[in-house]
C-alpha cells in the first residue's frame, strides 16, 4: 500500500473537537493506548495516533478506489446522518444513515429482494402507474415506497456486497460491524473512548459525537476516495 501525504493537521483536529472522548467512567480499557490525558472528567484522545491511523485509512481507500472497489459508509446516529449522506454522494459511495436493518449484508439475498421491490415501485411511480390504482392500494404502495426510500435509499444502486465498509460510530453500529467481520469485509471505524480498537481493520480514534469531528474525518476519507477514483479513470 502506497503511503501518501493527506495534510492531516493537528490544530485543525483540535478545532474540530476530534480529541474529546467520553467521560472517564464510560470507557473501554482496550482504548488506553489511544488516550493521552484526562481533563475535567473526560478522556482526551492522542491526536498523533489519530493522525497516523487516519493517514493509513486514507492510503487504504485511495488504493481501493484506484482499483475500482466499492465502498459503504454507515452512520445512523442523528449527528452523523447528514454528514454521512453528504460525504457518500460526493464520493459516489453507498451509505446507510437511518437504520441498519439486521442481515443487510449477511442476508444479502433478502436485501436484494427488497432493493428489487424498491426499484419496481419507483419505476411504477415514475410512469404514473400508482395513480391508476384504487386509492387504498395506491396509499399502501406509496407508504411502502417511502419506507424503502428511508432505509434503502442510500444503497439503491448497490448490486453486491461492498469491498470496504466505513463505520462512523462503532458502538452504535455494532451489528453492521459484526456482519462485516462474519463476511470478511474490511472495515474502517471511528472509535471513541468507549470502543474496542481491536474489532476493526483500521480504527481511527476520534470524537464520534461532534458533527465537526465526524465531518473532519469523513472529509479526509472522501478526498482520498475521490483522488483514487480520478486515478482509476485516468488509467489506460
From Swiss-Prot:
It comes from the Eukaryota. GO terms for biological process: translation. GO terms for cellular component: mitochondrial small ribosomal subunit; plastid. It comes from Cuscuta exaltata. Keywords: Plastid, Ribonucleoprotein, Ribosomal protein. InterPro entries: Ribosomal_uS2, Ribosomal_uS2_bac/mit/plastid, Ribosomal_uS2_CS, Ribosomal_uS2_flav_dom_sf. Signal peptide: none annotated. This is Small ribosomal subunit protein uS2c. GO terms for molecular function: structural constituent of ribosome. The gene is rps2. Gene3D superfamilies: Glucose-6-phosphate isomerase like protein, domain 1 (3.40.50.10490), Helix hairpin bin (1.10.287.610). It is found in: Plastid. It holds the Pfam family Ribosomal_S2. Belongs to the universal ribosomal protein uS2 family. SUPFAM superfamilies: Ribosomal protein S2.
Amino acid at each position: 500500500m502506497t503511503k501518501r501525504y493527506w495534510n492531516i493537521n493537528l490544530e485543525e483536529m483540535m478545532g474540530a473537537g476530534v480529541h474529546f472522548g467520553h467521560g472517564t467512567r464510560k470507557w473501554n480499557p482496550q482504548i488506553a493506548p489511544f488516550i493521552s490525558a484526562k481533563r475535567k472528567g473526560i478522556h482526551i484522545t492522542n491526536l498523533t495516533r489519530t493522525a497516523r491511523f487516519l493517514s493509513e485509512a486514507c492510503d487504504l481507500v485511495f488504493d481501493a478506489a484506484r482499483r475500482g472497489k466499492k465502498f459503504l459508509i454507515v452512520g445512523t446516529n442523528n449527528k452523523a446522518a447528514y454528514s454521512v449522506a453528504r460525504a457518500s454522494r460526493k464520493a459516489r459511495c453507498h451509505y446507510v444513515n437511518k437504520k441498519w436493518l439486521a442481515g443487510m449484508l449477511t442476508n444479502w439475498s433478502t436485501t436484494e429482494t427488497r432493493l428489487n421491490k424498491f426499484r419496481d415501485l419507483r419505476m411504477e411511480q415514475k410512469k404514473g402507474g400508482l395513480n391508476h390504482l384504487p386509492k387504498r392500494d395506491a396509499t399502501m404502495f406509496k407508504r411502502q415506497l417511502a419506507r424503502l426510500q428511508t432505509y434503502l435509499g442510500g444503497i439503491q444502486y448497490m448490486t453486491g456486497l461492498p469491498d470496504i465498509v466505513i463505520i462512523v460510530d462503532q458502538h452504535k453500529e455494532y451489528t453492521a460491524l459484526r456482519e462485516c467481520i462474519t463476511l470478511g469485509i474490511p472495515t474502517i471505524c471511528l472509535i471513541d473512548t468507549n470502543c474496542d480498537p481491536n474489532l476493526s481493520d483500521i480504527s481511527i480514534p476520534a470524537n464520534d459525537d461532534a458533527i465537526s469531528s465526524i465531518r473532519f474525518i469523513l472529509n479526509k476519507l472522501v478526498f482520498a476516495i475521490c483522488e483514487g477514483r480520478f486515478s482509476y479513470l485516468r488509467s489506460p
